[in-house]
């Protein structure tokens, strides 16, 4: 495995798999115990997502995989997780993998990172944002949620989930704080830095292929513990679909899927393969 030196002096492991054009994916590849996997399934998540993505996409691309979220939970950057530093971190990962140009796929806040990366570099040959709209992004509501999480973590470092309680898939309001003060503060830092970010004024290179997708039911409702906010993702993507297409985006709103189900490998793998294949054919056609 290669390693990249990040902005805070920590190093992150990188897996490179396959041949072809480089495709950077911030994916969690660590194996799950059966109990961990079952808990994730109970919540509606896909415990095999990372390995499945890498295995499927490395058949056609040189996949550069690094667990950036896991790294930041193990090595928080509470004061320095800014958009500029996040972009620099992903460029460092690409450099360590000797990827002069690369595609990028990220989901949820890692999709946000991809947008911040795209406005700071000309090295991308494709950008895919899943589970976070490029226009009317939920920056204010996510700041409220992360501030609430940080306040709860700061009050107690010993909060843990109740054991063997049934969970309702997608019941985000029932989630318990399992992160510490530094881990949560880094996301406050990130979203505070994005409060003045005007996604309606973002001008990406016209020739950069880009895809945004989300489930039509991707809306997360938080109660008083989390700031009484609703994080809307599918709704703004659908509302701005025509505007985004006119700006050069491809848009897919996935019927009836929520935030977790829209990121499952059985949804994402065929979607990415089809779209990336189209991008490749279009680029070959322009070169002929």
Labelled PLM ranges:
Residues 245-288:
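Catalytic active-site module of serine/aspartate enzymes centered on a nucleophile-bearing elbow/loop
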Residues 212-214:
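Short beta-strand/loop motif that positions the catalytic acidic residue
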Residues 44-73:
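Conserved alpha/beta-hydrolase
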Residues 134, 184-202, 234-238:
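Active-site nucleophile elbow and catalytic-triad environment of alpha/beta-hydrolase enzymes
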Residues 20-35:
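Short beta-strand element of the alpha/beta-hydrolase
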Residues 216-253, 259:
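Conserved loop-alpha-helix segment in the C-terminal half of the alpha/beta-hydrolase fold
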Residues 112-123, 127-155:
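Flexible "cap/lid" loop of the alpha/beta hydrolase fold
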Residues 84-102:
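Conserved acidic catalytic loop of the alpha/beta-hydrolase fold
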């Amino acid at each position: 495995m290669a390693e990249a030196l990040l902005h805070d002096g920590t190093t992150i492991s990188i897996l490179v798999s396959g041949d072809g054009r480089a495709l950077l994916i911030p994916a969690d590849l660590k194996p799950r115990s059966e109990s961990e996997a079952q808990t994730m399934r109970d919540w509606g998540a896909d415990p095999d997502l990372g390995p499945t993505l890498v295995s499927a996409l490395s058949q056609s691309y040189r996949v550069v995989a690094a667990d950036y979220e896991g790294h930041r939970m193990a090595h928080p950057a509470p004061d320095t997780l800014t958009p500029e530093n996040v972009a620099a971190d992903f460029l460092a990962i690409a450099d360590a993998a000797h990827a002069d140009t690369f595609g990028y796929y990220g989901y949820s806040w890692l999709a946000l990172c991809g947008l911040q990366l795209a406005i700071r570099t000309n090295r991308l040959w494709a950008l895919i944002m899943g589970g976070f709209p490029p226009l009317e992004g939920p920056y204010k509501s996510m700041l409220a949620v992360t501030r609430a999480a940080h306040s709860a973590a700061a009050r107690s470092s010993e909060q843990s989930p109740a054991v063997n309680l049934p969970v309702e898939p997608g019941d985000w309001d029932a989630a318990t704080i399992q992160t510490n003060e530094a881990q949560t503060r880094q996301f406050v830092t990130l979203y505070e830095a994005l409060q003045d970010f005007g996604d309606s004024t973002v001008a990406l290179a016209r020739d950069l292929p880009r895809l945004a997708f989300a489930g039509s039911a991707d809306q997360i409702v938080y109660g008083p513990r989390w700031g009484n906010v609703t994080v809307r993702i599918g709704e703004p993507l659908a509302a701005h679909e025509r505007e985004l297409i006119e700006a050069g985006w491809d848009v897919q709103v996935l019927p009836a899927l929520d935030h977790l189900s829209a990121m499952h490998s059985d949804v994402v793998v065929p979607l990415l393969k089809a779209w990336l294949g189209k991008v490749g054919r279009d680029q070959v056609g322009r070169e002929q």
